[in-house]
């Protein structure tokens, strides 16, 4: 009997502290015998990683940026995510489409209707039920005030073009995440990221346990 795959994404503005908890959750799933695929967006495949470098570092308009992100996502889905889910893996992805709506949409002001069209087109999966659009089974959103995120990023490693944006940009991005959660609340677990690391981890763990995926 094949174990059903699970797709979990992790979202939040830069500085929210996702990475530590992604690794911890991977360990928790593996401890219960599950195969785990760790990945990220943009990226996850050789082609998508090349596009990631362009998106994070090169100057371009919002449309070019969005198209590159969705091109990377299509390759990521076809080459990595869908095969992993078909094997029954737990796929843990650092950012997915919600980030595109938050960063390119709310942050950069790109047309949300076009993003919705790209989401439907790029994330439709052949062979599954009609009109199926691949999105995570659970999205863990690390909600952090923009000003606190800016403090965390100050003096860190050399920032990419998004990390170097002003606080107001991250306020818009946070609003974009809130709008996505409001549109699909059952998919989201909102985590207060301005807590101790252990408190944040407990909230993440409880969100996954509530779905019956960990004991």
From Swiss-Prot:
Keywords: ATP-binding, Kinase, Nucleotide biosynthesis, Nucleotide-binding, Transferase
Enzymatic reactions: dTMP + ATP = dTDP + ADP
Membrane-crossing segments per the record: none
GO biological process: dTDP biosynthetic process; dTTP biosynthetic process; dUDP biosynthetic process
Any one GO molecular-function label of the UniProt entry: dTMP kinase activity
Domain of life: Bacteria
EC number: 2.7.4.9
Gene3D superfamilies: P-loop containing nucleotide triphosphate hydrolases
CDD domains attached to this UniProt entry: TMPK
UniProt binding sites for ATP: 12-19
Cellular component per GO, a single term: cytosol
Family membership: Belongs to the thymidylate kinase family.
Known function: Phosphorylation of dTMP to form dTDP in both de novo and salvage pathways of dTTP synthesis.
HAMAP family named among the record's database cross-references: Thymidylate_kinase
Descriptive protein name: Thymidylate kinase
Lineage: Bacteria, Pseudomonadati, Pseudomonadota, Betaproteobacteria, Burkholderiales
Gene: tmk
């Amino acid at each position: 009997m094949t174990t059903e795959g699970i797709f979990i994404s992790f979202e939040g503005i830069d500085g929210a502290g996702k990475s530590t908890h992604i690794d911890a959750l991977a360990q928790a799933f593996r401890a219960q015998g599950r195969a785990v695929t760790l990945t990220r967006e943009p990226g996850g495949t050789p082609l998508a990683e090349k596009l990631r470098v362009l998106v994070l570092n090169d100057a371009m308009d919002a449309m070019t940026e969005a198209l590159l992100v969705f091109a990377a996502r299509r390759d990521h889905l076809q080459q990595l995510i869908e095969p992993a889910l078909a094997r029954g893996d737990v796929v843990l992805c650092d950012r997915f489409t919600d980030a595109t709506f938050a960063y390119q949409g709310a942050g950069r002001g790109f047309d949300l209707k076009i993003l919705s069209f790209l989401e439907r087109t790029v994330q439709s999966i052949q062979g599954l039920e009609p009109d199926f659009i691949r999105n995570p089974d659970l999205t863990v959103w690390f909600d952090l005030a923009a000003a606190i995120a800016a403090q965390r990023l100050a003096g860190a490693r050399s920032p990419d073009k998004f990390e170097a944006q002003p606080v107001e940009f991250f306020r818009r991005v946070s609003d974009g995440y809130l709008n996505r959660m409001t549109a699909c609340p059952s998919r989201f677990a909102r985590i207060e990221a301005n807590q101790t690391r252990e408190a944040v981890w407990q909230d993440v763990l409880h969100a996954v346990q509530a779905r019956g995926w960990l004991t």
